[in-house]
Amino acid sequence: MATEHILLVCWPAVGHARPMLDYAAAQLKQNPGLIITFICSKMQIALLEGLAISEHLADKKFGDRLRLLGTGRPAQEVLKEFGDREDAKNAANSASKAPNTTANGPEPEVILTMQAATLIQKRFAEIFPTILANDDLFDEQDNSLLLPACVAGKPTTIVVNWMLPGMVETVRKHSSDLKMVTFFDNSCTFVTRMLGPRSIGGFGGIERLWSQYCNSNPEVDPNDSTLKEKLLGRRWTGKFYIPGSRMGAIEEQEMAALAKDWLLSVPLTPSLIEIQKLVDASHTILINTHLAVEERELDYLRMVYPFKKIGILGPAMFSGFVEKGEKLAAKLLDKHINVKPAASRPLTPPETPPPGSPDTDSHGEEEDPKQKSVKQVEKFLAESATGSVVYISFGTMFRPQPTHLIKMLEIIIYEMSLSSQFRLLFTFGGSKDLASSCPPSFAPQISALESQLFKSGNTLFVNWVDQHYVLQHPSVGWFLSHGGWNSCQESMLAGTPLLILPFFGDQLFNAYFLESIQIAYRFNTAANMSVADFVASFREGITCTRPESERGSQLTKNAKELQLRLKGERALAEVRLF
């Protein structure tokens, strides 16, 4: 018998929606009497339902206990607008005599995400009274039933993603006793966002937190600058230091490239005031991390927020990731498939079409693209030596600048010329190929480099991979990532070291942090960085993948040791509350 009803309201981006959905699945597994209503954009729900990582949606294992409510426009309509915006952007760049490869304006994905967030905020304010009263929710246009009344009754708790503004006002307008919970990505980002100056993408909250600390500890002298610096860090020209974190000082010049002034001015960008309202109203702060990764940062948060419960979600999440790793290990053992030694790997091209070719099977019939990708990847990895594959994925929203991408591919081609064991698995994140995601003026050069890599026989380009499978395959030695926290956590759980090329916001915080715990190499991304400086940084990082690299060997060793600690923590399989 269902006895409790919880609302989860999420920011409309896969990087935020997926961990909240994983959290929902973990809670549903542990509590048979729980029902969860998950609210996000229609677009993100459609994406989650189509991703292999969301088995709890694909096979509906929780039935009516996991209720999905999408807001905003249908997925196909959003995808069409995305395509139109991409075409317009590329046309503008093509018409320009000097294409702007470092545009200050937001990418189409960011614009559409902000639009979807606006609709979530607006729609939630409209439907919350109905959900709170536990009445049936009907569509305003055709009067169809969108969400039936919950058999467990009205919600007792609402879990809100930290990015969504205006939620406290809506909830408290209709309920004074509904328990509120804030969902955050990781404690390092939480601290940096709340304390860091705006110039590095933070919200400048040092003074407010100091006032709160003094009010909570009357014996403290508000003018004690030494204690203030010790607890909250200090700002000096060019750097920002976070106490309690191994991350040390963030270079302000580098962060400026990612802080994006246009983003800070977008109406839906959460301000410090909005986040602080949510934190103040919340009974608990849930953080998607592991104690083995962020123990110092979590201790610091406990000190800054002594009256809040801090929940660590990592051990209770990523169940699908771990299950796939176990199945992969069993499959390799059962079929007596040993990853081939370096000398026995074939040097012939994989049996996949070059970029842009149609997907057909042996009879000339079209094959499902996702299934075709799965087969290609499995074959490619099976033919690869242990640790020889560098896997590259920048997620669904980000791409390197075209000039940087060209240099990246040239350096990778050079590395392949030095060693026949260097192999590359590159996923486009939904694009048809690399060239199609760049301004037309760069497409010929990028397409030529793609073809050169393909002809080497050591490269596989696909527009989709099962990342859970790939990261845990013994052939994969390195993960070149944009530094999204979900990808970072998956890489840590797989014991795979990272090469991080951050593009935006929290990604650089993550890159700095994982570099500080010595499981990642962070490529430099300073503001107005010259192509020559980027080349130097990328070349230094990619040499870590060489078997003889001492630095690379140490990063790999550290990643494997961290994986063992995470496995021990995961054995608890519970949300830990401080």
Curated annotation (Swiss-Prot):
InterPro entries: UDP_glucos_trans (IPR002213). Pfam families: UDPGT. Residues 90-104 have a biased composition (Low complexity). Keywords: Glycosyltransferase, Transferase. Pathway: Secondary metabolite biosynthesis. Residues 347-357 have a biased composition (Pro residues). GO terms for molecular function: UDP-glycosyltransferase activity. It comes from the Eukaryota. It is an enzyme of class 2 (transferase). Its EC number is 2.4.1.-. Residues 81-106, 342-375 are annotated as: Disordered. Induction: Expression is strongly induced under conditions of nitrogen starvation. Expression is positively regulated by the cluster-specific transcription factor rua1 that recognizes and binds to the specific 5'-T/G-G/T-C-G-C-A-T-A/T-C/T-C/T-G/A-3' upstream activating sequence found in all promoters of the UA biosynthesis genes. Glycosyltransferase; part of the gene cluster that mediates the biosynthesis of the glycolipid biosurfactant ustilagic acid (UA). UA is a secreted cellobiose glycolipid that is toxic for many microorganisms and confers biocontrol activity to U.maydis. UA consists of 15,16-dihydroxypalmitic or 2,15,16-trihydroxypalmitic acid, which is O-glycosidically linked to cellobiose at its terminal hydroxyl group. In addition, the cellobiose moiety is acetylated and acylated with a short-chain hydroxy fatty acid. Belongs to the UDP-glycosyltransferase family. This is Glycosyltransferase ugt1.
